[in-house]
C-alpha cells in the first residue's frame, strides 16, 4: 500500500514540475482509464509529425482540447485538474494506411456547458486542428452520454410527427429544389412551386443561396411560393409545403423572416449550416415554439468533411444537428452527383434515424450511442438524382427520407408538372413492387419501363436520363472493409 502511495505521489509531483514536459507525462494519457457512462467520447484520426510518438500526439490532442497549455501552470492546483483533464486512453493504427492512428479520448461531462453545441465544439474542434505536433487531424466520431443529451431539445417535429402532419406514410417524401436557384422573379418562382406540387411532389424548396437578392426579395418569394402551395394543395387534396429559406445576415432578420413564413401559412422553414451552431440552435428553439418543421441545408460542410485525413466526418455533424433540434438535414444520395460512399451514407442515416446504434466499423460508427429519446431527423437526398435511379434510391435509402429531384423535375422536356409526375409514378411503382415481394432492385429497370407504358412523362424521363450516372470513387470511404464504388 505504501509503495502505491509513494508511486502516486511521485507521479503527481512529476506532473507539476515547472516548465515544458510531455503531455502524456502531464496526465493526458491513461491506458488504464475506466470509461464512465457520463463521459463524452471522441475518436480522432491523427497524422503525427515525423518523430512524434502517436501516444504523445494523442495526449497532446486530449490536453489542448481540454485543460492544457504548452507549459505547466501552477493554477492547475486550484482546480480539480485530475478530473478535468481529458484522457487519451487508446491508440490504434489505421488499417492499411501508414502513419495514421485512431486516438480515443474521454472528456468529463463537466467540461461542457449544458445544451450548447457552441461550447462543445469550442473544445473538441477548437485550437487542436492547428496544433503543430500533428500534420493532420480529423474528428471521426463521438459518443454523447445520456446525461448530456438530456440537456438538448432535439428535433421538435421529427420523422413520426412529420408523417402524421403531412399524412404521408409507407414511402419516401418527394421533393424538388427550384431551379435555377438564382435569378427568377417572384412570380416565376411561385409558378415553379405550383407546377411541381401539382404534378405530385410533397415539397418544393429554396436552395441554399437564395435569400433576398435584388432580382427577388424574400417577402415576394414567400408570398408567391405560398400562393403556389395553397393552389396545388387545394387541387390535389393533399397537404403540401415549400421550404422557405430564412437564412439572413443577423438573427433579427432570420426571426423576422421565420415569423412571416408562419403568417403566410408555411408548415416548414429552412436554414443553412453556414449560419453557425448558435444560430441553428436558436432557430430550432423558435421552430419548436411555433410548431414549424425545420429543414437544414448542409451548405459548406464539404469544406471540412470531405477529406479523409483532416477536418471532421459528416456523421459528427449529423449527431450535433440531431442534438441541436433540426427536423431535416441533407445527408447524401449514394447515386447522385455529390460525394457519397454507400457505407458512409448508411452510417449517416442510421445516426439520424435510429433510437440506439451499436458499434459498426464498416459504417464508421466507433461508439455505441443511446439517443435518450431525442426524436429522429429526416435525412434528405438531393443532388443529381432522377427517376431512372428510383430502385437504387429506395434500396440504399429506404422509406424514411426526402428524395429531392431538382433538375430531375424541372429539367423534364415536357415541363415541370410532367417531371414531378414522372417521379411520383416511378416512386409509387417501385414501392408497390417492393410491397408485393418482388426483387425491385434487380427488376427495377423493367418495373420502370412497365410503369412508363401508361405514363408518358416517365417514359420521357427514362429516355432522357437513362445514361446519366456519376461514377466516381468517394474520397471518404470505409477503413475496415473494402467499399463498393460510391456513385453507381
Swiss-Prot record:
Heterohexadecamer of 8 large chains and 8 small chains. It comes from Porphyra umbilicalis (Purple laver). This is Ribulose bisphosphate carboxylase large chain. It is found in: Plastid, Chloroplast. It catalyses: 2 (2R)-3-phosphoglycerate + 2 H(+) = D-ribulose 1,5-bisphosphate + CO2 + H2O; D-ribulose 1,5-bisphosphate + O2 = 2-phosphoglycolate + (2R)-3-phosphoglycerate + 2 H(+). One of its GO terms (cellular component) is chloroplast. InterPro entries: RuBisCO, RuBisCo_large_chain_AS, RuBisCO_lsu_C, RuBisCO_lsu_C_sf, RuBisCO_lsu_fd_N, RuBisCO_lsu_N_sf, RuBisCO_lsuI. The record marks 337 as: Transition state stabilizer. RuBisCO catalyzes two reactions: the carboxylation of D-ribulose 1,5-bisphosphate, the primary event in carbon dioxide fixation, as well as the oxidative fragmentation of the pentose substrate in the photorespiration process. Both reactions occur simultaneously and in competition at the same active site. The basic functional RuBisCO is composed of a large chain homodimer in a 'head-to-tail' conformation. In form I RuBisCO this homodimer is arranged in a barrel-like tetramer with the small subunits forming a tetrameric 'cap' on each end of the 'barrel'.
Amino acid at each position: 500500500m505504501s509503495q502505491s502511495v509513494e508511486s502516486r505521489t511521485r507521479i503527481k509531483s512529476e506532473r507539476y514540475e515547472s516548465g515544458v514536459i510531455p503531455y502524456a507525462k502531464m496526465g493526458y494519457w491513461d491506458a488504464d482509464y475506466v470509461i464512465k457512462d457520463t463521459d463524452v467520447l471522441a475518436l480522432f484520426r491523427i497524422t503525427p509529425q515525423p518523430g512524434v510518438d502517436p501516444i504523445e500526439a494523442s495526449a497532446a490532442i486530449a490536453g489542448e482540447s481540454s485543460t492544457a497549455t504548452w507549459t505547466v501552470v501552477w493554477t492547475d492546483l486550484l482546480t480539480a485538474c485530475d478530473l478535468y483533464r481529458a484522457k487519451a486512453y487508446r491508440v490504434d493504427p489505421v488499417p492499411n494506411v501508414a502513419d495514421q492512428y485512431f486516438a480515443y479520448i474521454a472528456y468529463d461531462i463537466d467540461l461542457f456547458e449544458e445544451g450548447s453545441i457552441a461550447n462543445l465544439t469550442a473544445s473538441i474542434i477548437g485550437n487542436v486542428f492547428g496544433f503543430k505536433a500533428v500534420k493532420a487531424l480529423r474528428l471521426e466520431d463521438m459518443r454523447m452520454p445520456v446525461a448530456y443529451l438530456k440537456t438538448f431539445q432535439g428535433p421538435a417535429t421529427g420523422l413520426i410527427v412529420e408523417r402524421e402532419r403531412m399524412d404521408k406514410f409507407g414511402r419516401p417524401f418527394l421533393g424538388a429544389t427550384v431551379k435555377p436557384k438564382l435569378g427568377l422573379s417572384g412570380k416565376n418562382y411561385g409558378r415553379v412551386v405550383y407546377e411541381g406540387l401539382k404534378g405530385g411532389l410533397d415539397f418544393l424548396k429554396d436552395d441554399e443561396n437564395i435569400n433576398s437578392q435584388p432580382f427577388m426579395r424574400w417577402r415576394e418569394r414567400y408570398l408567391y411560393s405560398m400562393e403556389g402551395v395553397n393552389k396545388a394543395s387545394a387541387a390535389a387534396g393533399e397537404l403540401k409545403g415549400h421550404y422557405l429559406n430564412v437564412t439572413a445576415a443577423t438573427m433579427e432578420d432570420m426571426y423576422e423572416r421565420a415569423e412571416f413564413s408562419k403568417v403566410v401559412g408555411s408548415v416548414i422553414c429552412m436554414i443553412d449550416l453556414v449560419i453557425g451552431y448558435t444560430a441553428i440552435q436558436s432557430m430550432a428553439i423558435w421552430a419548436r415554439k411555433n410548431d414549424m418543421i425545420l429543414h437544414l441545408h448542409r451548405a459548406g460542410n464539404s469544406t471540412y468533411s470531405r477529406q479523409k485525413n483532416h477536418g471532421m466526418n459528416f456523421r459528427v455533424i449529423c449527431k450535433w444537428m440531431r442534438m441541436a433540434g433540426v427536423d431535416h438535414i441533407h445527408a447524401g444520395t449514394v447515386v447522385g452527383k455529390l460525394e457519397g460512399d454507400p457505407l458512409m451514407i448508411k452510417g449517416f442515416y442510421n445516426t439520424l434515424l435510429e433510437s440506439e446504434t451499436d458499434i459498426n466499423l464498416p459504417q464508421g460508427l466507433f461508439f455505441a450511442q443511446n439517443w435518450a429519446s431525442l426524436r429522429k431527423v429526416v435525412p434528405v437526398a438531393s443532388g443529381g438524382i432522377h427517376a431512372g435511379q428510383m430502385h437504387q434510391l429506395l434500396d440504399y435509402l429506404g422509406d424514411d427520407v426526402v428524395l429531392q429531384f431538382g433538375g430531375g423535375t424541372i429539367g423534364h422536356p415536357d415541363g415541370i408538372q410532367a417531371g414531378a409526375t414522372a417521379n411520383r409514378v416511378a416512386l409509387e411503382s417501385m414501392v408497390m413492387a417492393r410491397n408485393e415481394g418482388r426483387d425491385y432492385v434487380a427488376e427495377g429497370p423493367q418495373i420502370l419501363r412497365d410503369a412508363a407504358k401508361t405514363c408518358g412523362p416517365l417514359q420521357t424521363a427514362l429516355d432522357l436520363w437513362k445514361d446519366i450516372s456519376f461514377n466516381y470513387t468517394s474520397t471518404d470511404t470505409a477503413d475496415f472493409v473494402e467499399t463498393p464504388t460510391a456513385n453507381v
